[in-house]
Design a protein with these regions (language model features):
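Carbohydrate-binding surfaces of carbohydrate-active enzymes
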Residues: 1-6, 11-149
């Protein structure tokens, strides 16, 4: 079975968040799954390769817009061209601050970088459009198992 839209996931949390290992895991730890999703999707002729992003991060209200952009860039260079935001929670207006929040970067007007969020979404949309309307070229193959799997 081949999905209409292959999807990966960025699970970014690490038990080593207070060490240099966290920096490596944050950028590379699960990107192998993006490559698998993208490669399979491209072999099947799919134009859209999706990824649920910012699934689990340093914690609610602890993820900067700079980190979000950096992870987004890593997704694009590993073949992802469609972003699904994790953590865009619905919270009723009458709910006390900060609202109903659980996991992920928490995309909401309650976040301090919310006034600047449109700049990132515009950037993401432009790159998504370009990559969805271009032809992927890969000069390498990834053979399992790898250290990440």
């Amino acid at each position: 079975m081949i999905p209409d839209i292959p999807e990966s996931n960025n699970w970014l949390y690490s038990i080593n968040m207070d060490t240099d290992v966290w920096i490596w895991n944050q950028d590379h730890g699960y990107m192998i799954w993006n490559l698998y999703a993208a490669s399979g999707g491209h072999l099947a002729g799919r134009k859209i390769i999706s990824c649920e992003v910012m699934t689990n991060t340093a914690g609610v209200f602890k993820t900067s817009l700079e980190e979000i952009k950096r992870h987004d860039d890593m997704n694009f260079i590993t073949g992802i061209n469609h972003t699904v935001l994790h953590g865009y929670n619905y919270s009723p207006a009458e709910t006390d601050f900060p609202g109903w929040i659980r996991f992920g970067a928490y995309f909401s007007e309650q976040n301090t970088w919310w006034p600047y969020f449109r700049k990132w979404t515009d950037y993401n949309a432009r790159l998504s459009y370009i990559f969805q309307n271009s032809s992927p070229v890969k000069n390498i193959a990834i053979l399992s198992p790898t250290g990440d799997v």
